[in-house]
Amino acid sequence: MYGAILGDIIGSPYEFDFNNYKSKDFPLFCQRSEFTDDTVMTLAVAKALLDTCGQDDAAIKAALVHQMQQLGRAYPGRGYGAHFNGWLYEAAPRPYNSYGNGSAMRVSAAAELAKNLEQALHLAKLTAEVTHNHPEGIKGAQATAAAMFLARTGSSKADIRTYVEREFGYDLSRSCDEIRPDYHHVESCQETVPQAITAFLESSDFEDALRTAVSLGGDSDTLAAITGSIAEAFYGVPENLKAECRRRLTPELEALLLAWEARAA
């Protein structure tokens, strides 16, 4: 959970092409480093999945919709996409066939709660389908959750790469140095998730993973949130970064994060 939130916070000052900084030598935190919709939805999904452990798919989806709408309305103006922002305020919200990277940025809880890979994939699908029911939207969430689950259960980077390429058809052959020059702000899963996974695969530790993701440019907060979620599962998160993460949340969001830590453990 910390990985996605830290990626969001650290990447937030560099979002959009005019803010992109295509190098790794940037201040990890600055005055403009703040949480966005990525964090809000990550925590909403976490609460929904915790509240419905052991329940059926319909109950899980209902809880997802409730928590996402409730928390999203409590934190307006945090960078939600136009379609998603409309969904937040619908009385009877329905999925809208999105393949945006929002499904992947918020999926951490599915991989962290899952007892096996099959469950991680299933929970990821449920978290995506309430809004992002396009096959690419579901695939992005599942690929991220699978990489996370494999990382936290001892798989090597080579095994993670092989699994993601084989099962999801993502091309992970290009290096970050090859991606970086022409990469720009895009919000689709198919143009964000492979790049985020590549940033993790090339990293040397947790912080380097986030710096590498941000250095690619593009939708930097979401890209780093996806990379960070996988990097946390593989490396863990240094305590000083956890403390800084909590410091940059509101008391309500910090309480949700701490509740997740306590119950998920």
Which stretches of residues belong to each language-model region?
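Structured, active/binding-site neighborhoods that engage oxygen-rich ligands
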Residues: M1-A265
